[in-house]
Amino acid sequence: MAISFMNHGKPTPNGNLLIVDGLNLAFRWKHQNKLDFEHDYVRTVESLAKSYNCGEIVVLGDGGSDYRKTIDPDYKANRAERYKDQTPEEEAEFLEFLQEFGVTMKNLKSKGYLTIKYKGVEADDIAAVIATNREELGLEDIWLISSDKDWDLLINENVSRFSTVTRKETTLDNWDEHYDFDPEYYLTFKCLTGDKGDNVPGVTGIGPKRATQLIGQYGDVFDIMNTLPIESRYKFMQNLNEFGSDRLATNVELMDLTYDVDAAVLGHSQDILRLVENYVSKN
């Protein structure tokens, strides 16, 4: 579906929901060294809602990663390392960026859009609560706006994703244009290959191609865990044996957005559903 950023303005309520990965979208302007982006941000969100025929908009904030850090203290530990060598000017610029994002979120809320953020909770998990309760909330279709492929774990017949970075859609219908396995194996793929951005280790020597081959041969991550150890002369298979079922199980907990949604949002799931239900019914 073509996107037109000229078609801005408040959308008409219709039961379709746009869920925006708030900080993820804001980085679009950060990468352009543009720190005065409030107007452009709101305009873009409204344009996307119109383009995807979404009558309701929810923008999610990130409040931390408490749940996953209790599972693995090294989760996202590389983020601090990434910023430790910032100059004072870079630190000030980043603070200004975060302040502008805060102002933008307040502006979105003042315009009547729903914004949700909890201390210690990732935006991914708030999105998961909403997406997995789509029918109960009386929603038709959901469009996820994020460049984060982790959100593809939520894709189904009624939930799709658009990346403003690649400008590509990922839907159930075009899934095979992006991946060489069925959607139900995406979690397995991630558990095997890991996630460098989140500091989640994968199996050494297993990249996308080998992960896809293992899925075809053994099935999902639980099938693989039950099959280990696997006798093989290949080094990457020996690495998989050493990686072990326990680490694969940890990766499942870290990466599966639907594993325990209430725990992941620190018990806020009912509050999230109440906020969305009230917002949708009010519109």
Task: Show which residues each predicted segment covers.
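Conserved, surface-exposed functional patches that form binding/active-site neighborhoods
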Residues: 157, 176, 204
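A short, charged helix-loop
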Residues: 167-197
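Acidic, divalent-metal-coordinating active-site segment for phosphoryl/phosphodiester hydrolysis
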Residues: 149-150, 209
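Conserved cytosolic headpiece of P-type ATPases
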Residues: 268, 274-275
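Accessory alpha-helical DNA-binding modules that contact the DNA backbone or grooves
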Residues: 185, 193-264
